[in-house]
Design a protein with these regions (language model features):
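HTH-adjacent hinge/linker in prokaryotic transcriptional regulators
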Residues: 1-54
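Glycine-rich phosphate-binding loops that contact phosphosugars or nucleotide phosphates
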Residues: 60-191
């Protein structure tokens, strides 16, 4: 009866379908891991190292660093604020997508994290940050998006955006790695400057 309820005529047919699906899921996970590893390896190239140094210098020179994002990117923003605060930098996460931005943004650097870079609420906030005079750094999965085009500095990590109709399943490992690289570089640059 179970086999019939699952939509199959026989147990061997069910078993075959299960094994086929299991193989497809396994293949997807391997490809996804390969893509993530390839993405992380790019961060050691001269292009990325120079970009990271430039952005780390901007972050180290800021009076305040604000990290902003929505959904899964909000969690990365919260981690980033905690990481930079732990290194002695005045930083905060502002992850409410409807929070009004009203401040004097001079000497404030805003780091916006978004996979797509085209989320309406984040674009609205980015416009407000820019209007307030903040320096805008964006970290997204590509450079062909609205946030990337409106930012002062942009870091793309070029990974496929995996979504279904309900949510994103795109890995956040590259964004997390970028935050850790920037945090370490900023700390070392400021430490070296003080000596």
């Amino acid at each position: 009866r179970f086999v019939k309820k699952m939509g199959y005529d026989s147990f061997p047919e069910l078993k075959y379908a299960y094994k086929k699906e299991e193989k497809e899921v396994s293949l997807y996970m391997v490809n996804d891991l390969d893509e993530t590893i390839d993405c992380l390896k790019k961060f050691n190239t001269p292009y990325y190292q120079d970009l990271f140094k430039e952005v780390a210098y901007i972050l180290g020179d800021a009076n305040m660093i604000i990290f902003d994002g929505m959904g899964d990117s909000a969690k990365i923003a919260e981690y980033a604020a905690r990481r930079f605060s732990g290194n002695g930098f005045f930083s905060a996460a502002l992850t409410d997508p409807y929070q009004k931005v009203s401040m004097d943004g001079t000497d404030i650097v805003v780091v916006m994290l978004s996979i797509s870079g085209d989320t309406v609420e984040l674009i609205r906030k980015a416009n407000a940050y820019k209007a307030a005079g903040s320096t805008l750094i964006t970290i997204t999965a590509s450079d062909d998006n609205t946030l990337a085009k409106m930012s002062d500095y942009h870091i793309s990590y070029y990974i496929n955006d995996v979504r279904n109709e309900l949510s994103s399943h795109t890995t956040q490992v590259p964004a997390l790695s970028i935050i850790e690289i920037l945090s370490n570089m900023t700390l070392h640059m400021c430490h070296d400057t003080l000596q």
